[in-house]
Amino acid sequence: MQKVVKLNNIKIGNDLPFVLITGPCQIEGKDHALFMAEKLVKLTSKLEIPFIYKSSFDKANRTSVHGIRGVGIEKGLEILSKVKSEFDCPIVTDVHSESQCTETAEVADILQIPAFLCRQTDLLQAAAKTGKIVKVKKGQFLAPWDMKNVQTKLEAFGVKDILFTERGACFGYNNLVSDMRSLAIMAELNVPVVFDATHSVQQPGGLGGSTGGERKYVELLAKAATSVGIAGIYMEVHQDPDNAPSDGPCMMKLDNLESILIKLKKYDKITKEK
């Protein structure tokens, strides 16, 4: 029987209807966060899709020293707390160091470990100590079966609820490719698997001083992943992605999200029919 992670009234499992994890790449301010959250809550309620709000207080791995990193942990958590209380939605955000875990866990329901840091034992242990759900993004440099080692670490540290996320694998320079087999391979570890449809179309460092991306393939990859049978879709959105401070070339336009989700629900239903 596949593992099911429970978060409030949401059940996350590979055999269950998919959960949507979405929001803007980084927190841009209180007004913007509340605007995005309101739109997303209304849309997911209308479509009856379980929803978890995601946004980052710090983009610590920007390509360039001049890249906009975000509002910082103190202001960021304050804004996420406001989103959580105003819209009664769960929160996931990423942590980049052991020192951030305890403070972040006061607001976030899920701690996300970035792909570049997925093997950092001390960070995994610090996240584990919070007692929160730990969501790990598979490194672009890792084989899917190597996530077993990450799982073993987290379980050794006492984590009961683990989520894994596929976000593409390095394919030469400045390019990623999505191997849909990895979703099934990680699911065999009895861990709910999420597909990151927007970061999977990244072209890391592809613009020289920043990361490029191919937004036009987000829907295609999301359909393919949903057809495999997964626990969740992770998809960053923005009302004006071309002018967003980070990951603009990858993020979906908010106005296009509804039509994509309607299609994904159909794929998901067919795949999971008994």
Swiss-Prot record:
SUPFAM superfamilies: Aldolase
Cell compartment(s), UniProt: Cytoplasm
Transmembrane segments: none
Keywords: Cytoplasm, Lipopolysaccharide biosynthesis, Transferase
InterPro entries: Aldolase_TIM, DAHP1/KDSA, KDO8P_synthase
Family in the record: Belongs to the KdsA family.
Name of the protein this chain belongs to: 2-dehydro-3-deoxyphosphooctonate aldolase
Organism lineage string: Bacteria, Pseudomonadati, Pseudomonadota, Alphaproteobacteria, Rickettsiales
Gene expressing this chain: kdsA
